[in-house]
Curated annotation (Swiss-Prot):
Belongs to the IL-17 family. Stimulates the release of tumor necrosis factor alpha and IL-1-beta from the monocytic cell line THP-1. One of its GO terms (cellular component) is extracellular space. Residues 1-20 form the signal peptide. Expressed in adult pancreas, small intestine, stomach, spinal cord and testis. Less pronounced expression in prostate, colon mucosal lining, and ovary. Glycans are attached at N75. One of its GO terms (molecular function) is cytokine activity. It comes from Homo sapiens (Human). This is Interleukin-17B. Residues 22-44 are annotated as: Disordered. Disulfide bonds join C121-C176, C126-C178. Keywords: Cytokine, Disulfide bond, Glycoprotein, Secreted, Signal. It is found in: Secreted. It comes from the Eukaryota.
Length: 180
């Protein structure tokens, strides 16, 4: 082999052998770079073991949190309030916003969880931060996010059989914002 082929061969071998080597961070920031995958240590559990321990633990916890939020919403006066006003004395961010929102309960019997808190804008316009009055030159619009739910899939009424469940993402209003 002549020298260009030898050089190409050596370059190929070095690249092939270097693929398994960890790379150093390329950023010039001081401190640590982006964290890599967790290596098991005396106080760390490998990520694959965490996911194998209880696959539905996170979803069950999520559904329990949603149920608690709905219960708190039902026990408060939040559902009755429909005023377009900002209350800076409250700690809740939805009432301190320039596009305040309240919550309603989105009920769907074929979904798990059956009830989801959903944001609804309290103003058509936005609250002017200087006058603290509604300004209709701007518009309050809902902000949407996708949340994981399970859908009950049951056979049509003439047929009988077990219902199945399917995990899906559903779009829900989670807050409001101001646009021009």
């Amino acid at each position: 082999m002549d020298w260009p082929h030898n050089l190409l061969f050596l370059l190929t071998i070095s690249i092939f052998l270097g693929l398994g080597q960890p790379r150093s961070p390329k950023s010039k920031r001081k401190g640590q770079g982006r964290p890599g995958p967790l290596a098991p240590g005396p106080h760390q559990v490998p990520l694959d073991l965490v996911s194998r321990m209880k696959p539905y633990a996170r979803m069950e916890e999520y559904e329990r949190n949603i149920e608690e939020m709905v219960a708190q919403l039902r026990n408060s006066s939040e559902l009755a309030q429909r005023k377009c006003e900002v209350n800076l004395q409250l700690w809740m961010s939805n009432k301190r916003s320039l596009s305040p929102w309240g919550y309603s309960i989105n009920h769907d019997p074929s979904r798990i969880p059956v009830d989801l808190p959903e944001a609804r804008c309290l103003c058509l316009g936005c609250v002017n931060p200087f006058t603290m009055q509604e300004d209709r030159s701007m518009v309050s619009v809902p902000v949407f996010s996708q949340v994981p739910v399970r859908r009950r899939l049951c056979p049509p009424p003439p047929r009988t059989g077990p219902c199945r469940q399917r995990a899906v993402m559903e779009t829900i209003a989670v807050g409001c914002t101001c646009i021009f």
